[in-house]
Amino acid sequence: MSASWVRGDRTAAWADLSAHFAASAANFDLRTAFAGDARRFERFGVEAPHLFADLSKNWLDAPALALLLRLAREVGLEGRRDAMLAGAPLNNTEGRAVLHTALRAPRDAAPHGSEVHATLDAMLAFAERVRDTAHSGITDVVNIGIGGSDLGPQMAVPALQAYTQAGLRSHFVSNLDGHELAPLLTQLDPQSTLFIIASKTFTTQETMANAETAKAWFLARGGRDIARHFVATTTNVDAAVAFGIDTAFGFWDWVGGRYSLWSAIGLPVAIALGATHFRALLGGAHAMDRHFATAPLERNLPVLLGLLDVWYRNFHGLTSRSVAPYHQGLRRLPAYLQQLEMESNGKCVDRDGEPLPFATSPVVWGEPGTNAQHAYFQMLHQGSDVIPVEFIAVRDTSHAHLDLPPALQPLLAEQQRKLLANCLAQSQALMAGKSEAQALAERAPTAAADMPRDVLARHRSFPGNRPSTTLLLERLDPATLGALIAMYEHRVFTSGAVWGINSFDQWGVELGKAMCSELLPRLTTGDASGLDGSTVGLLRKLGTP
């Protein structure tokens, strides 16, 4: 590791954070913090492009924050950030630059601007031709991809449903399991369907299996002109041509899969939204890039959230974080963040290959509110593990794009108020809790006749002091979504930089792939030689499918 890029645990700030935690932070109480600081909300509120973050309900005081910011400086975070934006090969295990930010920068504001914008212009022109359904004849667009070639577009299209074109339906197929693709095919007309085969290498097993099946269906149903109904987004254009595809939009090896929404992989988003809205998505992301690059660390939202992740993971020992978007359009955001965060930072060695003596990525999971409240919030409030929660709320929503009777508008507006009230109430309840004395003083609901009131009160009490962050979006539009996703990308970069890891490779995906290639023929031959006892037993149980 470069002498200017120090691993976090080797800094003086890390040692001082450990001492501060032992001395006082381990017993930090949010209720006491708010009682002692009438301006805590203002002190820990952060404005960033298109969103506001309330960090005040986190286990964070001024000394801890100062030490975390010192930690960022001692590991050389600003230098690493600037190196990434300039195109340095930060992905050191693959010798590649990390330049997803260049995909959303103005033409002359980042490396590779000319080629990026040439590809973008061509892709958006194609998207507009598809959207002209009177001439294209396309009514259904099916994106076939997996991982970074699926999760970003699959998250973005429903999030921006209000900006999509009526009469043009988007579908996403990722799973190797035919139960995802097969039922969809029964609903499609080959002459009005466009398939997008999204694979960086054009060799991904799941994607190519689904692509071959889609192609066979197209031909079996009398489909003609594969080149007009299949398009590829890939770095391997030759393989796409061999498949029978004439139209392919490329991208570059300095674009990681989970950072590729902004590239040609975003084609299904561009078709759904149109060129103007897709450029707004890029513009929102670029605004967050500039915030990350220029805002002081003390007011830099991605930096603060990344440092908070380190604080909780390495000093408080918390193992996971729950994401609860209070907007149904963001229902796929938790799944998107799972790949972005855990594939990036789920590493056990540093950039030099040295084993890490501390934990890295937390488990990231979640569901939309209020559904989540009726699923796992019981554990968040009363469970034995403390799990920080990230609430995402959208102030203004509209259903004007839908053909609904005007009489529904006040009812839907009231539903939105109730939704926001639920979001705020959950973060308040996690912090405030309810003591046994409070529970005992309340009129209790009907309980077992032989249960003493004090025992019931223990069941009905809440420990409180459970941390949360609330992200407030003015509205869910393309620019706001772009800023939100870019913020999460830079947050991942920040925590990865402190941990001294390469956040841009994913070797953990490869071993299972290799073993699958070895096992696949054995499912037919039954050959179990050289395998472990468990795998032998499972092969025998499966027989020959």
Curated annotation (Swiss-Prot):
According to its UniProt record, which residues of this chain constitute the active site?
E343, H374, K513
Question: What are the subcellular locations of this protein?
Answer: Cytoplasm
Q: Organism's domain of life? A: Bacteria
**Which InterPro entries does the protein's record reference?**
G6P_Isomerase (IPR001672), G6P_Isomerase_C (IPR023096), Phosphoglucose_isomerase_CS (IPR018189), SIS_dom_sf (IPR046348), SIS_PGI_1 (IPR035476), SIS_PGI_2 (IPR035482)
Q: Specify the pathway.
A: Carbohydrate biosynthesis; gluconeogenesis; Carbohydrate degradation; glycolysis; D-glyceraldehyde 3-phosphate and glycerone phosphate from D-glucose: step 2/4
Q: What class of enzyme is it?
A: isomerase
Q: Please write the reaction equations for the catalytic activity of this protein.
A: alpha-D-glucose 6-phosphate = beta-D-fructose 6-phosphate
Q: What is its EC number?
A: 5.3.1.9
A Gene Ontology molecular function term for this protein is: carbohydrate derivative binding
One Gene Ontology term from the biological process aspect of the record: glycolytic process
Q: Which GO terms describe its cellular component?
A: cytosol
Database matches in Pfam families: PGI
Q: Which NCBIfam families does the record cross-reference, listed alphabetically?
A: PRK00179.1
Chain's role: Catalyzes the reversible isomerization of glucose-6-phosphate to fructose-6-phosphate.
Q: Which PANTHER family match?
A: GLUCOSE-6-PHOSPHATE ISOMERASE
Record-given protein name: Glucose-6-phosphate isomerase
Protein's organism: Methylibium petroleiphilum (strain ATCC BAA-1232 / LMG 22953 / PM1)
Q: What is the lineage of its organism?
A: Bacteria, Pseudomonadati, Pseudomonadota, Betaproteobacteria, Burkholderiales
Name of the gene this protein is made from: pgi
